[in-house]
Regions:
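Core nucleotide-handling region used for phosphoryl-transfer chemistry
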Residues: 1-200
Length: 200
């Protein structure tokens, strides 16, 4: 099971783009997206142990402190972005200082997260307020197995875990329904993301 890596997009203004970060060691920080499970029937085996996380309705982003250039880098899903207090991603970092603290203590690990509060599902947040929820970590070009990532990132705020156990196709639709598990959200669950416990 491979992470869905869409093509790099050229959308957005070049004025706010930053040069991709320099990496110490192997790998990069590819763009990241999820795709519909209905398109990939049979990718999971009945009974295989999986994690099912809540799919939050927000903006996909990535963060990294590079030991090579000793800089903290902010990226949207498609682009690396200059740290400009006028943009949502920089504001989200300022409002969630635990993220930058963790990145600086764990250099060269890419943190993939969702910014919530910017889309039509507000998760209980007032206008201009954002929260970050982590859903993956990458090191040396490899996504870290999820249980290892949870332990390594125990000081991070993770997307809510909906289910852990044997994969059942019949259960997936049921898990998509109901209220968000984000504390104080007060809105519906957008969906779920199913992952194997061990990357494969």
């Amino acid at each position: 099971v491979l992470h869905h890596v869409p093509p790099e997009s050229g959308t957005g203004s070049n004025a706010d783009e930053e040069t991709p970060p320099a990496f110490q060691g192997q790998g990069a920080a590819p763009t990241y997206d999820v795709d519909s499970g209905y398109k990939y029937g049979g990718i999971f085996i009945e009974g295989e142990e999986v994690l099912v996380e809540e799919k939050l309705h927000g903006s996909n982003c990535r963060f990294l402190y590079s030991s090579k250039d000793q800089e903290f880098h902010i990226g949207s899903r498609n682009r690396w972005i200059k740290d400009d207090k006028q943009n949502m991603w920089s504001q989200a970092v300022d409002q969630n200082p635990w993220l930058k603290t963790w990145c600086m203590a764990n250099p060269d690990i890419v943190v993939y997260a969702e910014v919530v509060g910017a889309q039509d599902l507000k998760y209980g947040l007032p206008r201009g307020h954002y929260r970050l929820y982590v859903f993956d970590l990458m090191k040396d070009g490899r996504f870290i197995d999820h249980l290892e990532a949870y332990e390594l990132g125990k000081d991070l705020v993770w997307v809510p875990l909906v289910y852990r156990g044997p994969f059942q196709q019949s259960l997936m639709k049921e898990l998509c329904l109901g209220q968000s598990l984000v504390n104080g959200a007060g809105n519906i669950r957008e969906g779920v993301v199913c992952k194997p416990v061990k990357e494969r």
